[in-house]
Amino acid sequence: MVRVKHLLLIVVVGILFSCRSGEEVSDLPRPYHNLRFEKLPEVWDEALPLGNGLTGALIWQKEGKLRIAIDRADLWDLRSVEEFKSPDHSYQFICDQVLRKKDIAPIQRLIDDRTKYDAAPTKIPAGAIEFNIASLGKVRNVSLDLTSAVCTILWENGAQAHIFVPANEKGGRFFFENLPDTLSPELITPLYEENDAKLDYQPGVNKLTALGYKRGKVEQINPGTLLYQQQGWGDVSYEIALNWKSASGHSLEGEYCVTSKGTWYSEKEGALECMKQTMSNDFNSSLAMHKHWWREYWMKSSISLPDTLLEKQWYLEMYKFAAASRKGAPPICLQAVWTADNGQTPPWRGDFHSDLNTQLSYWAGYTSNHLEESAVFTDWLWKIKENAEAFTRQFYGVEGLNVPCIATLTGEPIGGWSPYSHSPSTAGWLSHHFYLQWKYSMDTDFLKNRAYPWIKEVARYFENISVRDENGERQLPLSTSPEINDNRIDAWFQKTTNYDLANIRLTYTIAREMAEALGLNEEAGYWVRQLSEWPKPAVDESGLMIAPGKAQTESHRHFSHLLSFHPFGLIDVSKGNGNIDLILRSIKNVEMLGTDWWTGYTYAWLANMKARAFEGDDVVRNLHIFIKAFCSPNSFHLNGDQLKAGYSQFTYRPFTLEGNFACAAAIQEMLLQSHTGVIKVFPALSTKWEDVSFRHFRAMGAFLVSASYEGGKIVSITVESEKGGLMKLYNPFTDKITERKMVTGETITFTNKFPMGK
C-alpha cells in the first residue's frame, strides 16, 4: 500500500508541474547531470551529499553497512582561546616583534603554535545512522537526482532505498522497499571517546577524542524510537531523535531530527518534539513539499552548453550551493553541512576562512539568480558585527570594523598562521559581498540598513589604523598578502601589499557609490578624499606585484596580489589599453611560474580571470583540469591533484568547497558579465562552441537576462527589469552600447530583426 501511495504521489506531482511551460520544465537538471555510481562509495569524502543549509547528510558504505552521516551547521566547539586573553594579543605586539625586534617566534607561540595541539575551537559532527545491508546482496546502482535532491539505492534483488534531507525540516527521511527480510537502523555516536577504530589522518586535524567530551548516551524511548543526547563544550549540546516503522517486514520508513541548544541557530524544542512535528507529515507528504522547494529553486536559472562536462558540473555546484546555504542557517564554512565523518575534526577545523574560502563560496550565487541563498553570507556577517567590532578594539586598538580572517561560528578568532589569521584588511574583501548583494538586488532597505553601515565602519577602521609615510600617503603599519611566504617573518610587509591595498581601495570606492545612492553627498566626498590618500597598486614588468619591491617570482596557490583585477574589477579590460596590458602581463606571469604549488581552487580562480580577459578557451582548459584532477567522484573539491598527473605537487585530499563554487562562477562569467555596469552576454565563450543558452541569469541593477547563441552567433537577448532603472547593454546586433530607461516589470527582447529591442 505504501508503494502504491508513493507512485500515485509522483504521478500527481508530475501532473501539477506539467502545467508549467514546456520550456521551463526542460530547463531542470536532466538525468545525465545526476551523480550515479555502480556501488556505494566507501570513503566519506566521496559520499552522496544531501542538505538543506542547516542539516546535512553523507550517504556511503562503511565496513559493509549503509551509513547516513549526520551533520548540523551550528554544531561547534566554541571554547575560547586562552592565549588570546593575553595583553600581547595585539597588532602592536606583532609590529614590535617584526619591525623592531625582528623576531617572529613570540608571535608564533602566542597565535600559531597552540593550533598544533589544541583541537578547539572547531566544527564538530553530529552522528550517523547505519543499516546492516549484508542480506540485501549486491548493489546495482546508486544515484543522486539533482532535480529532487533524493538519493536512491537499487539492489540486484529488487530492494530499494530512498533517502533525502527535507528542504524545510531539521533532519532526514528514509524509505526502503522490497526488502527480503526485516531491516532496522542503528544510531551511531561520534568517536568522542577512544576505541579501536583505524583513522585515515588528514592535514590539520585532530582526533575527536582530543575535545575531551564524554560520549552521550543513546536511549530507547519506545520500540522504533531512539534518542541520542550529546553535551558539547559549555552551553552547546545537541540531540538526534530517530524513529522508524516496518510494514510486513518488506518495507521500512523512518525519519530523524537533529536539534541544538546554546547556539544562535538553536530551537526551543528538543529533537523528540521536533520529530513529533515532522511526523505530522508522512514520507510521501514530506517528499512532495521537498520536491516542490527544489523545483522552485531550479526554476530560478538554467544553462545549456555544448561542453557536457562543464554543464554537468555547473548543475552539481548549484545543487551543492542550495544544499549548503539556506535562509536562517549559518553560511558555508570550509565543508558546510558535510563535516568529516572519520573520527576526526574536519580539515582546518571546518572554520570560516576569509582569506579566500568563504568569499569564493559565494561567487556563484549572484549571477545564478539565487540571492536568497547568497544573502545567508551577509546575514551572518551582520550577526557577527558586534563581536568583530570588539575584536577590532581589543586586537587593533582602534574603532571601526575588521573581522578575524580565521573565525568561529560567532566570529571569534581561532588563530593559525598569524599573517593571515590576523590579516589587517579581511573586512575589505568581505565588504565586497555586501556590495554584490546590493547591486544584484537593488534592495534600498538592505543598502541603507546593512550594506552601507557595515562598509562605513570598515572604512572608518582603515582610516584609524593607517599611518602616514614619508610622502604623506597612508599605509598600514604592517601588511600581508595571503598566503605569500607562509608563516615566516617575511610574510609581514612594511609597505602595504597589493592585497591589502585592493581591499582598502575597494572599500572606499563602494562606500562612495553607496553614499551617493543614499543621497549622502558630503559623506561620498569624504570617501573620495580618503581614497586619494592611499597609494596606487605596485606594478613592474611582470604585472601586479605582491608589494612594492616584491614581485611574484614563484608558483603559489593564492592570487592575493591580483585581487584588484578579480574579483573587484578596480582594474578591468573595460578601462582601456593600460589596464588590458597590465592584466595580461599579470596572468602570463602566474602561468609562467608554473602550477607546482597550486591547488584546485587556483585553477578555478584563474578560470574566472581568463573569463574577465575574454579568453574562453583557457577558461575551459582550466576548468577541465579542475574537474578531472581535483574533484572526487561526487564532485567535492579535494585541493590536491588526485590524478597525480603533474597539475600540482599537492596530491593530498582535504575536502573544501570554495573551489567548487569558484568553478560555477567561472562558467557564469563565460556567459554573462555585468560588473562594469554594462551587460555583456557571451563575453568569453570557447571558440569551439556553436550552440549555447542561459535563462534568467541576474545582472547588476536587478536585471534578469536570457540569451541564445546558435551556429556561432548571438540570436536573441531578453532583459527583464526587476526594479526599474537605466539598463546598459553591449548590443551585439549594433556593436554599440544600448541604453534604456526601464520600468519595473518591463521586458525587452533584442534580435537581428529587432536590434534595438521590442
What is each PLM-predicted segment?
Residues 3-10:
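Sec-dependent signal peptide recognition
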Residues 48, 311-312, 352-357, 369, ...:
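Aromatic- and histidine-enriched alpha-helix N-cap/loop-to-helix transition segments
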Residues 23-415, 456, 474, 509, ...:
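Aromatic-residue-lined binding/catalytic grooves and analogous aromatic/hydrophobic interfacial grooves
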Residues 17-18:
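C-terminal motif of bacterial Sec signal peptides marking the signal peptidase cleavage site
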Residues 84, 94, 346-351, 420, ...:
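Aromatic/His-enriched, Gly/Pro-containing loop or helix-boundary segments
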Residues 436-442, 446-452, 456-468, 524-552, ...:
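Non-catalytic carbohydrate-binding regions of carbohydrate-active enzymes
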